[in-house]
């Protein structure tokens, strides 16, 4: 695989130019590093904008859509993000492989939980923080790496 797109909540964790959830930041940084083991190019909007320190002055949806089009796999942590929902719509319409990271204790619409029925992918559940899902993500990336070779 050449490129992985990481879709996750963004705005709710930014206060001015400060990122306010260190646990989620740690998770996304570890996830990014893990993805770099499997793809030469990894897109994470949080990284592009330095976790709120360097917000884009002229943001355009077309920027993220271009990144999505060029991706082989998306790893999505939808939580309650409408932006991630839009990105999942793009990815499923393009039949991209989607790895969904869902909180076992949160309710999700069937459209999210069952997205793998219309596009390739897998749903992974975590408890007590997203970081506890990294092992499962690694195993899933390994599976898709072998299938895409």
Region locations from a protein language model:
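Conserved catalytic or regulatory cores that recognize and/or transform ribose-phosphate-containing ligands
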Residues: 1-149
């Amino acid at each position: 695989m050449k490129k992985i797109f990481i879709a996750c909540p963004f705005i709710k964790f930014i206060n001015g130019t400060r990122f306010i959830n260190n646990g989620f930041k740690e998770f996304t940084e570890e996830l990014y590093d893990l993805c770099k083991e499997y793809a030469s190019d990894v897109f994470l909007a949080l990284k592009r904008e330095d976790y709120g320190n360097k917000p884009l002055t002229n943001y355009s949806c077309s920027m993220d859509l271009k990144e999505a089009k060029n991706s082989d796999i998306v790893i999505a942590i939808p939580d309650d993000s409408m932006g991630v929902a839009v990105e999942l719509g793009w990815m499923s319409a393009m039949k991209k492989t989607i790895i969904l990271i869902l909180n076992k204790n949160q309710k999700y619409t069937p459209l999210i939980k069952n997205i793998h029925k219309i596009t390739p992918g897998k749903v992974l559940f975590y408890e007590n923080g997203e970081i506890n899902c990294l092992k499962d993500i690694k195993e899933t990336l390994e599976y898709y790496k072998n299938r895409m070779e």
